[in-house]
Amino acid sequence: MSTKSYDYLIKLLLIGDSGVGKSCLLLRFSEDSFTPSFITTIGIDFKIRTIELDGKRIKLQIWDTAGQERFRTITTAYYRGAMGILLLYDVTDKKSFDNVRTWFSNVEQHASENVYKILIGNKCDCEDQRQVSFEQGQALADELGVKFLEASAKTNVNVDEAFFTLAREIKKQKIDAENEFSNQANNVDLGNDRTVKRCC
């Protein structure tokens, strides 16, 4: 019997307008590389990275969705099962920021009720081209009730932090809560003295 190389699997989703840097952010996080050339994601792509949190190995399965309107119907199916969602906009593109509410509305409509969300203002290294201030980003995050970070895939600012913040919240609320429930169930079921061995 093969043993799993991780303790928990968490599915994350990257959403936002086309060109905001979703693929670049994912590439930086999963492979620590950056490409300046813009390649449009067709439909869906995903990458995997296993991280360690509180002594547990967490396998992150991160789905990169196409931002173009014609792919919206394809991507809605991928909201299901997602435990965390990164909503991205480009700080140099006000329109992508204005569209965050539409993306958020899609999440509310299609994702599970208690999915965790974080708002990311990408390309914060392009200070001279900035159209959206940090304060505007924070104000929108406060309005939507989500955490907020500015990041740069190019200069590797807050990239790990974005994914780790989301993973930490999910682990704390969902996985630890499940373990608590499981422990309570085990305490009640005193008649069952079987020893269950878990693979790690």
Swiss-Prot record:
Its main location: membrane. GTP binds at residues 16-23, 64-68, 122-125. GO terms for cellular component: cytosol; endosome; meiotic spindle pole body; nucleus; plasma membrane; prospore membrane. It is found in: Cell membrane. Pfam families: Ras. PANTHER family: LD44762P (PTHR47980). This protein is essential for cell viability. NCBIfam families: small_GTP (TIGR00231). This is GTP-binding protein ypt2. It comes from Schizosaccharomyces pombe (strain 972 / ATCC 24843) (Fission yeast). The gene is ypt2.
